[in-house]
C-alpha cells in the first residue's frame, strides 16, 4: 500500500508509517492541518515552562522520531467542551498517543474520558486510525494510584497504566 510520497507497511493488520506518510496523514486531517512538528517539538512547545516535563518522553534514537502533534491544542476550537487527548508522536513508524497528566486516583475518570474521546475521534481518521498505536499516560508528578484500587483495575481494563516516563524504542 503506497501513499503519494511515503510508504505504509502492514504489520499484524496495523500500518506503520514513514516520516512523509505520517506528516501527510496529519496534514490531511482538517483540525490538525498545520499542527505537525518535527521530532518531539509539539511536546517541547508545551513543556517550555516545565523543565521536568521535557524528560518525560525520550527517544532511544532521535533519527527515528518522525514527528509529533499537540492534539489538544489543534482540536480545541472544534471540540471546546470535550476531554481531549494531549499528543501523538510517530516513532519508527508506530504512533504513541501520550497524555501528560497528574496520576492520582481522582484523575482516573478524567483520563479515561480523554482516552474514550481519542478512540472515538480516531475512528474516521483513516491512516492515523489504522496505524499501529499505543496509549500512554505519563504522570506529571509521580504515580499516586494504589495498584489494587478500583481505579487501577479500571485502567487495566482499558490497557492504560500511568508511567513516570516513556522511552520510545525500548
Model-derived segments and their meaning:
Residues 5-6, 11, 15, 19-29, ...:
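Domain-level recognition of nuclease-like catalytic cores that cleave nucleotide substrates
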Residues 60-62, 92-96, 128:
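Short amphipathic alpha-helical segments, especially helix-boundary/capping motifs
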Residues 104-117, 121:
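Mg2+/Mn2+-dependent nuclease catalytic core
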Residues 120-131:
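Arginine/glycine-rich "motif VI" loop of SF2 helicases in the C-terminal RecA-like domain
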Amino acid at each position: 500500500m503506497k501513499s503519494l510520497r511515503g510508504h505504509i507497511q502492514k504489520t499484524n493488520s496495523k500500518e506503520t508509517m514513514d516520516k512523509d506518510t505520517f506528516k501527510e496523514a496529519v496534514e490531511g486531517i482538517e483540525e490538525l492541518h498545520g499542527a505537525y512538528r518535527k521530532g518531539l517539538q509539539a511536546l517541547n512547545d508545551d513543556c517550555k515552562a516545565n523543565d521536568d516535563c521535557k524528560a518525560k518522553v525520550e527517544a532511544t534514537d532521535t533519527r527515528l522520531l518522525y514527528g509529533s502533534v499537540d492534539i489538544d491544542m489543534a482540536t480545541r476550537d472544534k471540540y471546546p467542551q470535550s476531554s481531549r487527548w494531549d499528543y501523538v508522536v510517530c516513532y519508527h513508524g508506530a504512533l504513541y498517543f501520550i497524555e501528560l497528566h497528574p496520576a492520582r486516583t481522582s484523575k482516573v475518570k478524567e483520563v479515561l474520558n480523554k482516552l474514550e474521546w481519542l478512540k472515538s475521534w480516531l475512528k474516521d481518521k483513516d491512516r492515523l486510525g489504522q496505524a499501529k498505536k499505543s496509549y500512554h499516560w505519563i504522570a506529571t508528578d509521580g504515580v499516586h494510584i494504589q495498584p489494587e484500587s478500583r481505579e487501577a483495575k479500571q485502567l487495566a481494563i482499558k490497557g492504560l497504566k500511568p508511567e513516570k516516563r516513556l522511552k520510545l524504542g525500548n
